[in-house]
Structure formats: structure tokens, C-alpha cells
């Protein structure tokens, strides 16, 4: 906290959850815990709902990329590092109003992180969204993590965007009830 002079910003930094098979952030129990944490923070007197950020490293990079897309309407900006999710798990469409930074080492081939980061960059290049996606030359899984938060802190959430894109994707069989100012009144029967 002493490193950054951007109060009253709040950063949510997912790491490997300590419960559940495979320790993943997309599991329902983690979603419920995360939503409760967000609600409690938003009720605090010091909360600035337009200065809420998410970033993570490695497993936290996967988690923060999925959470960035699933809860894009909450974040001022998002910054996964040393991660890289398949786009079906973290659709870029939801990032229209959420500045997004993804930094991965160009030599980080574990779990195809460098390839998945390149796919994310190629998809975002087709948009006019605010983003920074880079494969850092000469780096493997351990990159310079200090580059992300100063970039994120430049941005504040726009609570009333003129345009919204929302791919209503599921995480662990669960969908959001709404997104931004949209609400789902009825879902089609998919059985």
C-alpha cells in the first residue's frame, strides 16, 4: 500500500484459492465469496466504486482475467499478469468499458500462456477498447510485476457508459443476473 500513492483505490488480487478441487477462481463457492467481498467493500464509507481494480499473477492472472470479464461492470481497470485464458473463458466483449492490461513473458510457454495472450491481443486489436496486451521479450514466467498497477491507476470506472457489450457466459454453470444496467428477466430453456 505504501508503494502507490493512489488512495482511495482498492485492488483485488486473486491468488490460488486454498479450497476446492483444482483451486480455481471460477468455481461457484469462490464466486459467492468474491461477490460478498465486493458488496461489503462497496458498503464501506471509504469506498470509491469507481476506483476498484483487479489484477493477479500466474494462477491469479488466470483468475483476474476471468473475473475481469465476468464482473467487467465493477472494475475501473483489470491487469492479469503471467496468465492467459482461452477467450471462451474470458470474452473480450465484456471489456468494452474496462481498460485491460495483460502482460506475459514471450518465453512463457507453460499452459500455452504466451499463445493465449497473443490470441487475446489479436482479438482486442479488432476493437476500439482501451487495452495494453504485451508479450515481454526475453521473459518467461517471471516478469516485471511493477508495470501493471501504475497503468491501472490511470483509469476510473465509468458508471454510465453510452454503449455496453455483454457476452453472458457461465462460470461453473452459473450466469450473472445482470450486467451494468441490464437485467436478465428470463433465460431460455437450454435442455
Predicted regions and their residues:
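The feature captures the conserved acid-bearing segment of alpha/beta-hydrolase catalytic domains
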Residues: 77, 82-153
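Stable alpha-helical elements in mature extracytoplasmic
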Residues: 30-37, 59-67, 71-74, 116-120, ...
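Sec-exported extracytoplasmic/periplasmic mature domains
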Residues: 6, 39-46, 69-73, 125-129, ...
Amino acid at each position: 500500500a505504501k508503494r502507490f500513492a493512489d488512495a482511495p483505490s482498492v485492488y483485488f488480487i486473486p491468488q490460488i484459492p486454498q479450497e476446492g478441487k483444482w483451486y480455481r477462481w471460477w468455481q461457484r463457492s469462490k464466486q459467492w465469496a468474491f461477490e460478498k467481498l465486493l458488496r461489503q467493500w462497496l458498503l464501506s464509507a471509504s469506498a470509491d466504486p469507481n476506483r476498484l481494480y483487479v489484477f493477479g499473477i500466474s494462477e491469479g492472472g488466470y483468475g483476474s482475467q476471468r473475473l475481469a470479464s465476468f464482473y467487467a461492470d465493477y472494475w475501473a481497470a483489470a491487469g492479469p499478469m503471467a496468465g492467459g485464458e482461452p477467450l471462451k473463458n474470458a470474452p473480450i466483449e465484456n471489456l468494452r468499458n474496462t481498460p485491460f492490461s495483460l502482460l506475459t513473458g514471450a518465453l512463457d510457454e507453460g499452459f500455452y500462456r504466451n499463445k493465449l495472450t497473443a490470441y487475446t491481443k489479436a482479438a482486442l486489436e479488432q476493437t476500439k477498447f482501451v487495452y495494453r496486451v504485451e508479450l515481454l521479450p526475453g521473459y518467461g514466467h517471471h516478469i516485471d510485476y511493477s508495470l501493471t498497477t501504475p497503468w491501472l491507476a490511470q483509469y476510473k470506472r465509468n458508471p454510465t457508459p453510452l454503449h455496453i457489450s455483454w457476452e453472458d457466459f457461465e462460470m461453473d454453470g452459473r450466469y450473472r443476473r445482470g450486467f451494468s444496467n441490464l437485467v436478465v428477466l428470463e433465460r431460455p430453456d437450454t435442455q
